[in-house]
Amino acid sequence: MPSLGQRETQVLATIIESYIASASPVGSRAVAEHSGLHLSPASMRATMSDLTDLGYLEQPHTSAGRVPTARAFRLYVDSLLRPLPLGSAERDAIADELSRQELEISGILRRAANLLSGHARQLGMVVAPSEDEARWRSIEFAPAAEGLVLAVLMLEGGLVRTRTVRVDERYGQDELVRFGNYLNEHFRGLSLSEARDRIGHELARAGSRLEEMCVRALALSRRAVEHMGDDRELIVNGTLNMLDHAEFTDVGRMRDLLAAIEERSRLLELLDRTLSERDVRITFCQDVADGAPDGLRGCSVISAAYGGDTPRGVVSVVGPLRMDYAKIVPVVQCVSRALTQLFRERFAAAPCRLP
């Protein structure tokens, strides 16, 4: 694909920004008025025709104007986008809203999804952190009821997981305390996934070399932690915002979008790709290769990881291809950074409960 000259680039940027604002095909007269280029009508039409031939514009059959393609938007967000930074008051308001006195991660992340959807006027999505890579701080057991033991696992980063384990024998409180002391001595500092693997390995080769107490402690802990980390939460807010956009006024299109939101595993897979990124990731859901649910075709996903050196999750905004990236990208960045700071300052020191 040949590179664009300054004239073509300026014309394309003008068309994209006009289309973002209006959702309507953009004609040569509107481009001439807003591009700042002093071109004759014939020269402007020729430039737009060249951009169409190059795959950056397309012309709906019912209109003389042009609309930008996904290729045009990719060039725009990669090379032409000039984000509009949030003011200090707006940044502080987001940080204050997230840092209200609330120790439950789920509540804070629901608040984050609400902030994303409210500021962007699109869908806001937040993926809760996976605790698999969080490091084991301590585990405690307590009798819960006849045939049940409560396990409370505390992880670095302030995450707390609880599980009720069904057992076939009675355990005294003193015995359960000894179990916890033994496990914490051997597994503190390991990630949850490493500890889970180590527990299985130790039980497989236990034989006669371990005391009965150690074997029973390992067996109980395996049942307590074997499924921890499997049920990550995906929070979605702002579905009704989509009805404000021309792309979703069709009932069938909106139904497809709602169906896509229900495809939790594919959404998580799509959003988790952001975890390896250092900054905002913008994904255009255009074809099967991107792995997005079918109902997101023609949508864009603006996402960023949060958490830093604590367990990491993802914040994102989902909307039509013609989203106002200059305004929304800074919002996603701000929420991501505010959550990261919050996790570092508060949750490393004070446990918070996951659902």
Curated annotation (Swiss-Prot):
Belongs to the HrcA family. NCBIfam families: hrcA (TIGR00331). InterPro entries: GAF-like_dom_sf, HrcA, HrcA_C, WH-like_DNA-bd_sf, WH_DNA-bd_sf, WHTH_transcript_rep_HrcA_IDD. Coiled coil: none annotated. Keywords: Repressor, Stress response, Transcription, Transcription regulation. The keyword Transferase does not apply. It comes from Nitratidesulfovibrio vulgaris (strain DSM 19637 / Miyazaki F). One of its GO terms (biological process) is negative regulation of DNA-templated transcription. The keyword Transcription applies. Negative regulator of class I heat shock genes (grpE-dnaK-dnaJ and groELS operons). Prevents heat-shock induction of these operons. It comes from the Bacteria. This is Heat-inducible transcription repressor HrcA. GO terms for molecular function: DNA binding.
